[in-house]
Amino acid sequence: MTDVTVKQLSEVVGTPVERLIEQLGEAGVSVSDADQTVTEEQKLKLLEHLRKSHGKSSAAGEGKKITLRRKSTTELRVTGSQGRAKTVSVEVRKRRTYVKRDEAEVAAPVEEAAPAPVLESKAAQIAKQVEEERKAAMDASRRADEERKAAEAARKAEQERKAAEEAARLEAEEAARREAEEAARAAEPETVAEAVEAAVAPPPSDAARPARRRRGPKEREDEKGGRREELHVASDKRGRRKGKGKGATRVAAAAVASKHGFERPTAPVVREVALPETLTVGELAQKLAIKAPELIKSLMGMGVMATINQAIDRDTATLVVEELGHVAVPMQVEDLDEELAVATAEPVGELKPRPPVVTIMGHVDHGKTSLLDYIRSSRVASGEAGGITQHIGAYHVQTNRGGITFLDTPGHAAFTAMRARGAKVTDIVILVVSADDGVMPQTIEAVQHAKAAGVPMVVAVNKIDKPEADPDRVKNELSVHQVIPEEWGGDTQFIHVSALKGTGVEDLLEAVNLQAEVMELKAPVEGPAAGVVIESRLDKGRGPVATVLVQRGTLNKGDVILTGQEFGRVRAMFDENGKPVKSAGPSMPVEVLGLSGTPNAGDDVLVLEDERKAREVALFRQGKFRESKLATQQAAKLENLFSQMQEGQVGTVNILLKADVQGSAEAIRDALEKLSTDEVKVKIIAAGVGGITESDINLAKASEAIVIGFNVRADAGARKAVAEQEVDLRYYSVIYEAIDDVRQALTGLLSPEMREEIIGLAQVKDVFKSSQFGAVAGCLVVEGTIKRGNPIRVLRNNVVIYEGELESLRRFKDDVNEVRAGTDCGIAVKNYNDVKPGDQIEVYQRVEVARTL
């Protein structure tokens, strides 16, 4: 067997070179360099020394064991649960134990004195065994050396081949490595499972140990079946990443088996999408987990033009969701209003009589407020602008027969909604009809409101003191509308009164009380209050003020109330005379302070125990109102898509409206919007209650709007802004004037109408030929005047056969500008020679006529 160097021997026995040189020195072998050769005799000498160092002699220790240990540590980089790389230390421990084969044969006791031939034979046996061991060790060393050299040569050839492949592959992977910087920083083995498996696998035989060495990730990948030659989607564009497994052999095998394929879903993902009443396109795309442009494309395919922030209704959303293959489910929103209705159901308590609520209705200027003025013994009408009522007045009057709550409604046509609200909350309607005017349009409307509300009527025939008064005429006209007097067999009381002199007022109150007794009006006094908003306004010093009519229960100062979209705690209450009150019972009108905003007239008022619940319901109602408003606006946009293209041809008057109370703002807004036509439109930019502020002026300037203040004024900042920005600001106290001014502004935007006016008619008597004009008609002017330069029509049997213009007008060979009736003339028609006797030539002119609404 060939000699080996110290370095090779250290690899065979698994001992560091420095330690082996030290052991050789202790055994008496002089070695100073790792490349120095060690002979077979020196190896045996070292073996003998090692045996002695373990407390064994050459003879006694031959039957004992020798153990060799080896420990190696490697580091692996693995990906953690959050995608971060971490280093794991892997320690491999190996142990080899060598036992002499014929242990029983050398177990003879040393103390016995053996004969000399036996000793010699034993010595020969030992020498023979040592020689066999030496030869076996030399053979094993030779084979290991040959295997190592062969493996080294194969490794070098493989490395050269793979280096060329690696260079080509790196070129192709450059783009992927730039996108996956995190993958490029982490260099891991192909799988953690392989590394762990290699670390804990049973070690090979001792003879194969020299050929074992730590291989790099590239070499392990080479031996596992070849390098990847292409990039794969399944590897997430990270061709340099190796770590995929969790440590188990089965998982690693499955990962290796499937890492070269595309991972595609086996079935389409079907989602259940909960849809509210309205939602934007962006919100729907988020629910569907798709990009908004794809959803917009689908909507366009269905004929719906929408942007990402545009709202669509539930029906449209359902159609597009089903078109995309998903399931649409209507969102079940918890209806807080229903819960509130159950929680605030009418309390069961002792019912006590309550005063009647009486609404005075009728045509404008028929004396409604004057009648109430006489009853209240105050001058209410003098305080109304123009002597007409502009909003509902609620008053509680004590009479000799008990209390009565009166509601005075406007009679003007613009206040239809106010009268409808008055009929809704009332018990009895007093219909005031002027004895001299009779039944008028608003009188008929008041009858319809009362019948729709199912409220009994008492007719007050007013102005009975006038000489031209005719009460029977009123009865006849009302009977046409099924209002039959009692004396005619009906059920309606007719009372003749004079609001100016007080005639018949007591009889009217008696009739009201009689009707109230028949109705047996009762309401619970105890418990939380409920009522309705009669009117609301924004007071500069006190904030939102609402006139509330209590219908049941008792409203106390400090109660938490909810009305429409507003809520708040009652900070103060005042009666109709402005005196503070602490509580109000059924049928009592009071002004309430402390709401979060001005509620709409007609909203229900409820008292709640919890302010948090009131806020929750108010916010819920605001959300519903916003959704419905958004849906309405969107529907209008979609319906008017083509009309908006021609919007430049439509004249528009922009109005910013501020009024003293909510009802007046609503009435004026409705009246102004009714003035719109197909050619001119009134656009209300904003409408509200309260004084005119600087922000209102800025808004009006930006939108080029006219600012209308109805019973309100601009503050100092607003007046300064008006002067600087030259905004048109107008104050009104009578609704007629506001409507008339806006109507005039709209009239100015109307394009003038072109009308044709016939100015002359001539009868053709004969036709002459002219070398200059061709056919010339000799005519007699029958009507009007024939003028040169005006357009004409040629009529035959009263049918127009030609339209053109006069080319020449002559009288006795002289050119003239006009010819009057009864005079002969010659008329040459331009570009027309088919004039015949008996035809008529009609001369007309186009006149611009200003249009009115």
From Swiss-Prot:
Domain tr-type G, residue spans: 353-522
UniProt KW Transferase keyword: no
Biased composition (Basic residues): 238-247
Segments of skewed composition (Low complexity): 189-200
Pfam (any one): GTP_EFTU_D2
InterPro entries hit by this protein: DNA-bd_dom_put_sf (IPR009061), EF-G-like_DII (IPR053905), EFTu-like_2 (IPR004161), IF2_assoc_dom_bac (IPR013575), IF2_II (IPR044145), IF2_N (IPR006847), P-loop_NTPase (IPR027417), Small_GTP-bd (IPR005225)
Region (Disordered): 51-87, 131-249
Keyword list, A-Z: Cytoplasm, GTP-binding, Initiation factor, Nucleotide-binding, Protein biosynthesis
Region (G1): 362-369
Region listing for G5, in residue ranges: 498-500
Comp. bias (Polar residues): 75-84
GO MF term list: GTP binding; GTPase activity; guanosine tetraphosphate binding; translation initiation factor activity
Region G4, annotated ranges: 462-465
Stretch list, region G3: 408-411
GO terms under cellular component: cytosol
Biased composition (Basic and acidic residues): 131-188, 218-237
HAMAP family reported in the protein's UniProt record: IF_2_B
Function text: One of the essential components for the initiation of protein synthesis. Protects formylmethionyl-tRNA from spontaneous hydrolysis and promotes its binding to the 30S ribosomal subunits. Also involved in the hydrolysis of GTP during the formation of the 70S ribosomal complex.
Protein name: Translation initiation factor IF-2
Organism annotation: Thioalkalivibrio sulfidiphilus (strain HL-EbGR7)
Lineage: Bacteria, Pseudomonadati, Pseudomonadota, Gammaproteobacteria, Chromatiales
Gene that encodes the chain: infB
